[in-house]
């Protein structure tokens, strides 16, 4: 358990809203969308909603594992555990709520314990089919600014995106990102609150063109009906594999019984084993 400051902001998980003394605050993801409005513009809403549901499940499972030591029944969570272990990262907080006291608030996915330099690391979990580095760099940099504002004297050293994709889109990876300074983050937040045009800020801090990993965006470019078909096929293939394994186990069990009782042939109306 950490000794971080507890935010007075009230987070409504169902409505995904942040409220401070009756006033509604914006989330950091809204600032990211303002800065990069075209990231998901061509993706059907149904695909985005399905991806969001999957992402929420993985987030909750990772948090469950950190807090209770179980929940690693999914491959993505096992990869999360592996990445933490391989990089010597210890979770202090999940979904740690931070705010600027007036306009914005958000929950940081993971806060890791201090490193050798005495600074904390922040991480955001992504389950998308590829990583939009500029988007998550902005997101985590604002998180770092808010974290340090809420916890005077405590410093953030490293920012990580924990990429936990479905198996067909690549291997899970821990990516370190370069931080945008707090002074610049304050300027960006101020411009967002004032409803300024994001273009000058996007050009200044990101060169006007979004950078991403080289992973092909297969999932997001698929029409919803094809994506649904793909998911169903993968589900069926998994079930078939499981049933074949179970069939093998049962037949081996029957064969062992036949040997024990000196039965050379088993035959019924539905099954024959020799």
What are these regions (language model features)?
Residues 1-105, 113, 252:
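Metal-dependent nuclease catalytic cores that hydrolyze phosphodiester bonds in DNA/RNA
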Residues 47, 127-130, 237:
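Surface-exposed cleft-lining segments at the edges of enzyme active sites
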Residues 72, 96-193:
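Nucleic-acid nuclease catalytic cores
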Residues 81, 234-274:
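Extended, charge-rich alpha-helical segments
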Residues 54, 58, 136-139, 246:
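Hydrophobic (often cysteine-bearing) scaffold residues that line and stabilize catalytic clefts
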Residues 58-59, 143, 236:
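A residue-level signal for conserved active-site and pocket-lining positions in enzyme catalytic cores
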Residues 189-245:
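Short, charged, low-complexity amphipathic alpha-helix
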Residues 45, 49, 134, 220-223, ...:
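Short, solvent-exposed segments of well-ordered alpha helices
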